[in-house]
């Protein structure tokens, strides 16, 4: 389930391919939008679209690119240390659904955040496909702890595609937890260390 928002900096929820909820308790330092909202709000967001990952990586990234899929956009402003985690939830509600999301995370210089992502299906939607493209950008001396917690159906096919670029002195921790058997899972996250002291675990 979704944890009480009193213990979270913010929450964003997608059901199938549409955003159903977005809230933010730390607006002074954390920005939470849908990817499409961010693209419309800021001209510079286009510089982060398909920069960490090529849309030609495979057929799943290509489909995400061609459909201009929505997803979540999380930005932590320069020097800001978030007091609580941001939680995201991706739920597949309808059976035989293709959930296709494109997420962007930007950690500005010296910022810090923990993100907890929960992904699941309803009991009636197990025979579905989840594609989640996540591009993560850590500027110098930033810190991100990113945890995916998945609970899929036994017939669900899951194709997370994650790429991170990590600047000088920045630290990125990536955890993946699968709570129960899944039909098919294919994942190959890639991190690029782009400066002295950059680290990924």
Regions found by a protein language model. Name each.
Residues 1-18:
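Short, Gly/Pro- and small/polar-rich lid/capping loops
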Residues 15, 22-33, 40-201:
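Conserved beta-strand/loop scaffold segments within soluble protein domains that form the structured core
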């Amino acid at each position: 389930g979704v944890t009480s928002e009193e213990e979270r900096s913010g929450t964003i929820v997608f059901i199938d391919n549409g955003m159903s909820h977005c809230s933010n308790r730390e607006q002074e330092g954390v920005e939470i939008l849908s990817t499409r909202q961010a693209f419309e709000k800021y001209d510079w967001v286009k510089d982060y679209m398909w920069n960490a990952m090529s849309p030609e990586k495979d057929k799943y990234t290509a489909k995400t690119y061609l459909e201009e899929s929505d997803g979540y956009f999380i930005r932590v402003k320069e020097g800001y240390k978030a007091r609580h985690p941001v939680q995201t939830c991706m739920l597949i509600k309808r059976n035989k659904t293709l959930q296709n999301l494109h997420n962007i995370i930007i950690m500005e210089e010296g910022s810090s955040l923990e993100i907890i992502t929960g992904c699941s299906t309803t009991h009636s939607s197990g025979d579905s496909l989840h594609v989640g493209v996540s591009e993560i950008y850590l500027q110098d001396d930033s810190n991100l702890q990113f945890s995916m917690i998945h609970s899929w159906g036994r017939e669900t096919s899951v194709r997370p595609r994650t790429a991170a670029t990590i600047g000088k002195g920045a630290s990125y921790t990536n955890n993946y937890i699968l709570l129960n058997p899944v039909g098919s899972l294919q994942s190959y996250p890639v991190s690029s260390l782009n400066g002295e002291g950059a680290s990924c675990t």
